[in-house]
């Protein structure tokens, strides 16, 4: 957790409503950080429906492997998250640490280890000593409360400068249901199937298979469309849980993601996921500017997204944004190197509402002064139209500053 809060941090945080059936506790275990919480326990009073997406890294952490195995059962009684150590690339010791943590949590809750989900975030390659915190889980289970969402978000932070929370309330049938989410992430952000760590809970009575479909579809335009540094973590975990307690108030049980009664819920879930994903980008390590990259006129949506990510991940584009330099030539470069269909002589580029390039050359009306003034803002929009199709995509990133280098150069110090 950084000593100074990102200038892109939210000015206000939402009041996080209670979701019946889930309670949360945090603790300071001293895993890496001193003087702050670094352990979070989420308890479901009754088995909750569970869905998840995880990193596609071929070097996944021990907790990711553990979660994948347990997700087959589709039920959850608890989630344990530690920060300061990723428990990744830790071999047998890592697997033993996950098992010890799961057994301690299962004992504290009174359930099987197959109902436990785990996540760890922090340094890769250092063995995790579960003995530092497993003994705390019993007291945490007893003291857990329904209104600890923001504190939970703080406990899972690493180099984050602020907690990331989001909430939505929407009607399912005629009954209000709530969706709450927390996330962490500031570096090693280029998710592929998930984000760094994010946990979303609803009281809607939605079965696991339907939840999984909703989540898998929802990540495409949210968490899978953000990047800070193009590095996909070994620990990426995004989980969605449903306590189902809204059924007690008359909410209908949903078993199929195609159920038309889910229309408003899907939109609300999308807003929660997008809010959390963009908060991660806005807290990118050392970030001073948020960047939206929109690509239109591509051969396909998939092609548009690859080109958008080529722009968003380009160190030259990102440093130009950091330096408030209207260097649109670097955008041309990033389009050209993406390996996707493009026609130089049909290409158009905008910074904000200012068209800077058109039909293979600088726009005749280009104004360096106007474009440079635009680059001084905190929120930068780069739009590219390829003019060869109807495919479109939007991704989000941040600038690349000297602070990013300093943070990561000193990460293990």
Swiss-Prot record:
Role: Catalyzes two activities which are involved in the cyclic version of arginine biosynthesis: the synthesis of N-acetylglutamate from glutamate and acetyl-CoA as the acetyl donor, and of ornithine by transacetylation between N(2)-acetylornithine and glutamate.
Claim: Cytoplasm is one of the keywords in the record: yes
SUPFAM superfamilies: DmpA/ArgJ-like
Keyword Transferase: yes
Pfam families linked: ArgJ
Gene coding for it: argJ
Pathway(s) of this molecule: Amino-acid biosynthesis; L-arginine biosynthesis; L-ornithine and N-acetyl-L-glutamate from L-glutamate and N(2)-acetyl-L-ornithine (cyclic): step 1/1; Amino-acid biosynthesis; L-arginine biosynthesis; N(2)-acetyl-L-ornithine from L-glutamate: step 1/4
EC number of the protein: 2.3.1.35, 2.3.1.1
Site residues by UniProt (Involved in the stabilization of negative charge on the oxyanion by the formation of the oxyanion hole): 121-122
Catalytic activity: N(2)-acetyl-L-ornithine + L-glutamate = N-acetyl-L-glutamate + L-ornithine; L-glutamate + acetyl-CoA = N-acetyl-L-glutamate + CoA + H(+)
Organism: Brucella abortus biovar 1 (strain 9-941)
Recorded GO CC terms: cytoplasm
Binding positions (substrate): 158, 184, 195, 285, 408, 413
Entry's Gene Ontology BP terms: L-arginine biosynthetic process; ornithine biosynthetic process
Record's keyword terms, sorted: Acyltransferase, Amino-acid biosynthesis, Arginine biosynthesis, Autocatalytic cleavage, Cytoplasm, Multifunctional enzyme, Transferase
Subcellular location, record wording: Cytoplasm
Record: active site: 195 (nucleophile)
InterPro entries according to UniProt: Arg_biosynth_ArgJ, ArgJ-like_dom_sf, ArgJ_beta_C
Subunit structure as annotated in this protein's UniProt entry: Heterotetramer of two alpha and two beta chains.
Protein name: Arginine biosynthesis bifunctional protein ArgJ
Family assignment from sequence similarity: Belongs to the ArgJ family.
Cross-referenced CDD domains: OAT
Principal localisation: cytoplasm
One Gene Ontology molecular-function label: L-glutamate N-acetyltransferase activity
Residues the record marks as site: Cleavage: 194-195
């Amino acid at each position: 957790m950084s000593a100074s809060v990102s200038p892109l941090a939210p000015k206000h945080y939402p009041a996080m409503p209670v979701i019946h059936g889930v309670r949360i506790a945090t603790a300071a275990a001293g895993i890496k950080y001193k003087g702050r919480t670094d352990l979070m326990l989420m308890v479901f009073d009754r088995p909750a429906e569970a869905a998840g997406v995880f990193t596609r890294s071929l070097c996944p952490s021990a907790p990711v492997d553990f979660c994948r195995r347990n997700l087959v059962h589709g039920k959850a009684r608890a989630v344990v998250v530690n920060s300061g150590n990723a428990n990744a690339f830790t071999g047998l010791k890592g697997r033993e640490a996950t098992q010890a943590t799961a057994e301690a949590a299962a004992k504290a809750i009174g359930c099987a280890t197959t109902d436990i989900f785990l996540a760890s975030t922090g340094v890769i390659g250092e063995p995790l000593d579960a003995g530092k915190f497993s003994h705390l889980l019993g007291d945490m289970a007893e003291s857990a409360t329904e209104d600890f969402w923001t504190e939970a978000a703080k406990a899972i932070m690493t180099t984050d400068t602020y907690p990331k929370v989001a909430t939505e309330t929407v009607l399912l049938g005629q009954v209000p249901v709530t969706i709450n989410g927390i996330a962490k992430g500031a570096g090693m952000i280029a998710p592929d199937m998930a984000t760094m760590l994010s946990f979303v809970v609803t009281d809607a009575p939605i079965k696991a298979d339907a939840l999984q479909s909703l989540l898998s579809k929802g990540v495409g335009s949210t968490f899978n469309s953000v990047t800070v540094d193009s590095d996909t973590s070994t620990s990426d975990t995004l989980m969605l849980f449903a306590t189902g307690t809204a059924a007690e108030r008359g909410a209908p049980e949903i078993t199929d993601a195609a159920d038309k009664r889910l229309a408003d819920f899907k939109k609300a879930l999308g807003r929660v996921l997008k809010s959390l994903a963009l908060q991660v980008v806005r807290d990118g390590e050392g970030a001073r500017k948020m960047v939206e990259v929109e690509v239109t006129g591509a051969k396909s949506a998939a092609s548009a997204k690859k080109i958008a990510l080529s722009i968003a991940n380009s160190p030259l584009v990102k440093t130009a944004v950091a330096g408030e330099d209207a260097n649109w030539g670097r955008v041309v470069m990033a389009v050209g190197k993406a390996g996707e269909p493009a026609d130089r002589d049909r290409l158009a580029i905008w910074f904000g509402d200012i068209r800077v390039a058109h039909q293979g050359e600088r726009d005749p009306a280009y104004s360096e002064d106007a474009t440079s003034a635009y680059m001084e803002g905190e929120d930068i929009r780069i739009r590219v139209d390829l003019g060869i199709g109807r495919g479109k995509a939007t991704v989000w990133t941040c600038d690349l500053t000297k602070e990013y280098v300093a943070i990561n150069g000193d990460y293990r110090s």
